Structures are given as structure tokens and as C-alpha cells.
């Protein structure tokens, strides 16, 4: 821990808390996980990959092409908008999208990395006893998406070990 009395700006060394819920012994870079972050001036939570996970997202792209209705069904069952959950992350700029990919799945198809995050979080919720319930409901809402992606990550790990 840093002694702030010797710094010019007196800022704390650690100004936020980051919790991630992922499988034990799984490398962070390849991991799909839920997270919760609390900072001095922000708070958020969601689901996603730590970094770009090209193999897993390539599998998602193949699934979108092969079974768009199944992927849409999973996303619809999450009711992301109803829970104020929003897709974020970066997208490929020049990745060709097959004509068979429906318009509503194109952002998912083009994802280079992604996360689904709660938006509209108010800072005062950090002091509200309903916070745990809010986070739990959002995590449960994202569970179908987690299961879809988790299956893909597990398949990749099994393939790489074989």
C-alpha cells in the first residue's frame, strides 16, 4: 500500500474494486465471466470476455450463420433492453458479413470483443440494500447468453486439449 502522505495529489492508490466471477484456473484472457466494478465515481456490472477471444467469437459467428433463430432465441430470452443491458465492445470494420445474417444479429457477428453491461446505473445504488437484488436479476437475465458462450468456450478448450 502506498503512503499517500508523500504524494503530491494525495489520491488513493486503489480507487476501485473489480470482482470477476470465472472458472478457477482458467486463463483470464480466454475466460468468459461475470463482473462487478465499484469505483469512486462509477459502478457497473455485466458479462463478457476480458480481451479479444477470436476462437470463441468465430464459433459464435458460425452459429449465427448456421442457426440464427437459435441465437436470436437466446438473446430474446435474456430481455437485454428490458433489464437495461447493452452490448458493448469493438467491432471489425472490414469483416464481410454473409447476406444470410439477419440485421439484428450483425452487431454480434461483427464483434471483435464484447461485453454486455448494465447501463443507467446510479451511484447512490452503491448504498442501497437493493443493489444485490439488482445485480442478481441482471446476472440471471444474462444466464442464457452465458450458457451459449460457455458451451463454445468449453468446446474450444476440449478441442485444444485433444
What are these model-predicted stretches?
Residues 14, 33-35, 50-52, 57-63, ...:
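General "foldedness" signal
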Residues 38-99:
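Compact, glycine/acidic-enriched structural inserts
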